[in-house]
Regions:
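Active-site anion-handling motifs in enzyme catalytic cores
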Residues: 1-174
């Protein structure tokens, strides 16, 4: 499966056919069925349906709001995730899944830079051929060691945050 974490944003209309072409390519070349995994309900379902209407391959969408643990579990089972929605990228990277970002904002650029990802395109200029090249790179296994290091780093940072929060709670005395 190839996951997609989409959201409505300025510039998405022009990107929809490019995203659909890349999803069809992933199915034809790699046998990966597109799965649209919304983070925000119901707003993330609309771009999923719009891309789905352009596809020539089978596809699925998570149409019912899931607990966040289930959403993360679904993303963890993808071969790669293509995302506009920052949390789809964060959750996937944290589970060791290679990600392709389509950035609409500095926060997406910042996260992908933070994890050392080279697989980011600007939403305003997404082209299917570039998306397909990055999907190939993610699926090939060439990024596996980098992706595993990223997941380990994110888990370590999460533990540091938990320890920091616990220390702050102890300091508050309540």
């Amino acid at each position: 499966y190839i996951g997609f974490g989409l959201r409505n944003w300025k510039g998405l209309d022009d990107a929809l056919p490019e995203i659909a072409a890349a999803a069809d390519y992933a199915y034809e070349k790699h046998g990966l069925t597109p799965v649209f995994v919304p983070i925000e309900f119901p707003s993330d379902l609309m771009p999923a349906e719009r891309v789905g209407a352009l596809l020539h391959c089978p596809w699925h969408a998570v149409r019912i709001r899931q607990p966040i643990e289930t959403t993360i579990g679904i993303l963890a089972r993808m071969k790669t995730v293509v995302g506009i929605r920052l949390h789809s990228l964060m959750f996937s990277a944290g589970q060791g899944v290679p990600v392709v970002g389509m950035s609409y904002d500095i926060k997406v650029d910042g996260f992908l830079k933070y994890i050392g990802s080279r697989t980011c395109l600007q939403l305003s200029s997404v082209r299917a051929d570039e998306l397909c090249r990055l999907i190939d790179e993610c699926v090939s296994g060439a990024l596996d060691s980098e992706v595993h290091r990223t997941a380990e780093m994110l888990r370590d940072r999460e533990q540091e945050n938990v320890k920091g929060a616990a220390a702050l709670l102890r300091l508050s005395g309540d």
